């Protein structure tokens, strides 16, 4: 029997955790976020890699990121995350979640 692939850890920044904890349990976004967490646990590269020249300076200075990814939810919301590696393990760190409008503001579109 083949070995089962190890799942990635999915964590959130302090800001994301505060945002997520404020979402009511019955809000459809909460369910959608849980679905995305599951997807990223299985494959941390499911999102779209954001080119370095588009990274907001805030992420570089605050989180010292080495990569940046975006995952667009069905609702149009986006999560921004970075992938950290430790030995053979990957950790997905969700930095922020945005509506489309707020995402465009953060990235200067």
Name every feature range the model reports, one short phrase each.
Residues 1-7, 18-22, 65-109:
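Enriched for short, Lys/Arg-rich terminal
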Residues 24-30, 54-64, 85-89:
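Short, charged helix-to-loop "capping" segments that act as catalytic/coupling loops
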Residues 33-34, 58, 74, 82:
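General helical structural elements
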Residues 42-71:
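A short, surface-exposed loop/turn module that caps and links secondary-structure elements
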């Amino acid at each position: 029997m083949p070995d089962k692939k190890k799942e990635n850890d999915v964590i959130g920044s302090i800001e994301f955790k505060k945002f997520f904890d404020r979402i009511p349990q019955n809000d459809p976004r909460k369910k959608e976020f849980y679905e995305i967490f599951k997807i990223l646990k299985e494959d941390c590269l499911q999102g779209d890699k954001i080119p370095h020249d588009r990274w907001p300076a805030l992420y570089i200075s605050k989180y010292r990121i080495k990569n940046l990814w975006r995952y667009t939810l069905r609702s149009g919301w986006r999560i921004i995350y970075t992938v950290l590696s430790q030995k053979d393990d990957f950790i997905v760190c969700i930095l922020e979640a945005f509506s489309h409008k707020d995402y465009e503001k953060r990235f200067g579109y």
